[in-house]
C-alpha cells in the first residue's frame, strides 16, 4: 500500500503527528484516516466488481452475436456454454416481472381509482360553511349581555 514510503518515513510521520496533534487527539485522527482509507478501498472494489460484471455481460453478448453469425449448428463448447448462461440470465430477469404481472391482472383495487371533484362533492354535500352554521346558534350572537355594564369598566373597553 505504501509503495515508495519506507519504515523511516512512516516513523517520521508518526512522530510529527504526535508532536502536532498531541497524545489525546492522535488516536482519533488515526481512526478517522483509516476510516477514510477503508471507505475508498470499498468504493474502488465495488467499481471494480461492477466493471468486471459489465465486461462479462459484454463478452456474453459478443459470443451470442458470434454464434448468430456462424449459425447455431457448429458451435464450440465455450460458445454453447455462454449462450446457455445468457439464456439463464435472461430468464432470471424476466421471472420477477412475470410473477408481478400475473398477480396484478387478477384483481383491480378500487382504492387506486381517481375521482373527479364532482364525484367527491356528491358523496359529501356538507360544506364548511354549513357545518359552522350548525355549530353556532344565531341567538347567541344577537342577544346583548344582561346585567353587566362594561361602559364604566376601563379594562373591558380597551
From Swiss-Prot:
Name the residues that span the membrane. 2-22
Q: Which Pfam families match?
A: TatA_B_E
Q: Which UniProt keywords apply?
A: Cell inner membrane, Cell membrane, Membrane, Protein transport, Translocation, Transmembrane, Transmembrane helix, Transport
InterPro entries the UniProt entry points to: TatA/B/E (IPR003369), TatB (IPR018448)
Q: Where is the composition biased (Polar residues)?
A: 88-107, 113-136, 143-158
The protein's topology relative to the membrane is: Single-pass membrane protein
GO biological process terms, alphabetically, are: protein transport by the Tat complex
* UniProt keyword Transmembrane, yes or no: yes
Q: Which GO terms describe its cellular component?
A: TAT protein transport complex
Where is the protein localized?
Cell inner membrane
- Gene Ontology terms for molecular function: protein transmembrane transporter activity
Chain positions covered by the region annotation Disordered: 86-158
Top-level division of the source organism's lineage: Bacteria
Q: State the family named in the UniProt similarity comment for this chain.
A: Belongs to the TatB family.
Please name the PANTHER family in this protein's record. SEC-INDEPENDENT PROTEIN TRANSLOCASE PROTEIN TATA, CHLOROPLASTIC
Quaternary structure annotation from Swiss-Prot or TrEMBL = The Tat system comprises two distinct complexes: a TatABC complex, containing multiple copies of TatA, TatB and TatC subunits, and a separate TatA complex, containing only TatA subunits. Substrates initially bind to the TatABC complex, which probably triggers association of the separate TatA complex to form the active translocon.
Summarizing the function annotation, the protein's role is:
Part of the twin-arginine translocation (Tat) system that transports large folded proteins containing a characteristic twin-arginine motif in their signal peptide across membranes. Together with TatC, TatB is part of a receptor directly interacting with Tat signal peptides. TatB may form an oligomeric binding site that transiently accommodates folded Tat precursor proteins before their translocation.
Name of protein: Sec-independent protein translocase protein TatB
Q: Which organism is it from?
A: Shewanella sp. (strain W3-18-1)
Name the gene that codes for it: tatB
